[in-house]
């Protein structure tokens, strides 16, 4: 079917140039069955969506099951709100046993949500507090630990600029806006921003205040060092803690939060796209950052209990020390012999050119780009008429 539709699309390209009517492509079985499926689902207020195909059919055609699984999702259909719980497909769980308890956890959460609702309450958020209010919050004696998170305008922590920083506990979070998503706007007057930074410096240097965060011992640490000139301590990185608890599973905060809390899908939208990179307003980004902090604070106690029950305290200390070394190595960098690098670059570029010429000679296509999946697809399956390997036994 795909091969036939590719041929139709090629023909339509020429027909458009010739001013002729285009030929409709052949619909897939999923597209043919979609109207009936939607009609059958219309009477159900609660849906368990197992696997990517089910998530695409019930939530959004671009939905990703790994980005949405375990996250309670509400969809508006025909004036009604439908509750959908995306879960891994049972076949995947049977093949990959490490997902078994994740699958059971998602089902348990779905049953609770469908029957009585979830008990997760969003944190109370204070946006852009004054220096005085921020200091009062960060010096409260009844708080045993704080979690924090930063949002930036880039992925590389040595060059990224900080947009906001959030600090808090499971139910209360303060978000300090620094740089607008437009790259120019600020949230404090210059003199007040200086005061805010001084309060934050005192907080991060206060050894009596335990700090925690997800990947905070690496990315967030380097951002804070570059921005404030201080190293946060003492610090617990929940990503390292979860690595000891469940070494074979993903360690992203979205995954950990979906497993240990009843929070909705705050990391991604319904299409599975990360909100950290796609927020349209400063408020959306700041709210996202606040949720990161609250959920990190919520999962930390249970993760630490599991580490203690496994007697992994020595391992977690070792992991944090290694992380410190890695962060310092990233900051310092390494010496590069530029003369030798340039020599190796020339050798590799010549090898690439020679291989490209050889490939084009073999294929008889002087314009072939070996890095183009589209061109290779047409070459392998249209021109050479090869059969794509469907099973492991067919691979050569």
What are these model-predicted stretches?
Residues 170-211:
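Nucleic-acid-processing active sites and adjacent nucleic-acid-binding tracks
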Residues 59-71, 84, 88-94, 168-170, ...:
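Metal-dependent phosphoesterase core characteristic of DEDDh/y 3'-5' exonuclease domains
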Residues 34-38, 135-138, 200-201:
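Short hydrophobic/charged patches on amphipathic alpha-helices used for structural packing
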Residues 45-51, 147, 208-217:
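Acidic beta-strand-to-loop metal/phosphate-binding motif
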Residues 23-31, 122-129, 184-193:
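Short, flexible loop segments at the rims of nucleotide/cofactor-binding pockets, characterized by
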Residues 1-118:
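A polyanion-binding, active-site-adjacent surface
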Residues 109-186, 218, 248, 260, ...:
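Conserved "right-hand" nucleotidyltransferase catalytic core of DNA-directed polymerases
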Residues 85, 145, 210-211, 233:
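Hydrophobic "anchor" residues on beta-strands that sit immediately upstream
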